[in-house]
Amino acid sequence: MTCVTPTTPDVTPAVLREQMARWPTGVAVITTIGSGRPIGKTVNSFHATSLEPPLVGWCIDHRSSQFAEWMAADGYVVHVVAHDQAALMSHFATPSTDRFRGVDWVAGLDGMPVLVEPVPLRLECRVSHRLPAGDHTYLVGEVITITTSDAVPLCLKR
Ligand SMILES: Cc1cc2nc3c(=O)[nH]c(=O)nc-3n(C[C@H](O)[C@H](O)[C@H](O)COP(=O)(O)O)c2cc1C
């Protein structure tokens, strides 16, 4: 039997967040160079934007403790999280002044931090657009390099 909930005009932040969980997404750890140090965070707003030119994007919350550093960044590295890397997802979502403590990384494109742990997909990007949208800013990036593995991506769904 199909169960349909009533339509609601009550689109509060909590309602929207809860109901958008019906839209399955992957999860990515995004890294960059902040103020002289690597920074990174877990996101599920990441998605493909354009094929020609090759653009991807994700949205950063204006309340992020590192918002100014992300706005100043010229690029970012997308690490798509594998199905068995829930710990990596949690690590980069947990508040910390240094999420890179104990994490192996090397300098990649433009010196940006690349996680050594293999992931299904890694994209090194240069920022092409910074587009404010409500309480988030959309960071569009041109894909410069693509690295893949056979690992299966993690899928978040309700
Ligand atoms: C599954 C998941 C998805 C998330 N997606 C986003 C996102 O798309 N954009 C964002 O700014 N924060 C997102 N967050 C929150 C960040 O990972 C982080 O916890 C939060 O921004 C606080 O850290 P910060 O102060 O370094 O930004 C997500 C967290 C989780 C667990």
Label each residue range with its predicted role:
Residues 1-158:
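Basic, polyanion-binding surface patches
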